[in-house]
Amino acid sequence: MIDHQNPDGSWYYGTQTHHRWVDNFHTGFVLECLFDYINFSSKFELRSNLKKGLEFYQDNFFLADGTPKYYHDRIYPIDIHSCAQSIITLVKLDSVSEQNQELKDKVALWTLENMQDSDGYFYFQKKRFFTNKIVYMRWSQAWMLKALVTLLISQKEFTEKTSKDRVGTSHILSTS
């Protein structure tokens, strides 16, 4: 994987010539896998590859308002899987970059405001002139459930940790 990282920090979808694009969720998968590999193998010399990849991700896959882009070089389509994977990746790599804190919240808020129907389900894709509102359980709903649960768990852990640090006890926030 390291040998296939581009000089700008990105990774192509695949090694074949017809796979020469860079997309949000596959980049997120790669970043998460690299993060885990570094942590489980203690190959800390690969942290520079992770940081370079994460910087590319942060700089190229998001608009200022938190809109997650499908491809690094264009806005549309905006796909719910990109929204979900963005949240998951930014939460997981929270310790790598402080920028992730604000960005994950922006992405989550943008997604809830722009990709969620008033009935609660999430849209499949927003294109330039229309929105595909088909309900796909695996592609849309399941991934957003995973993303939102991941975000909520990270916020709960953060709140518990900061409460413990400030007060000196971990039982301040009780779930009962």
What are these regions (language model features)?
Residues 1-176:
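Glycan-recognition and catalytic cores of secretory/periplasmic carbohydrate-active enzymes
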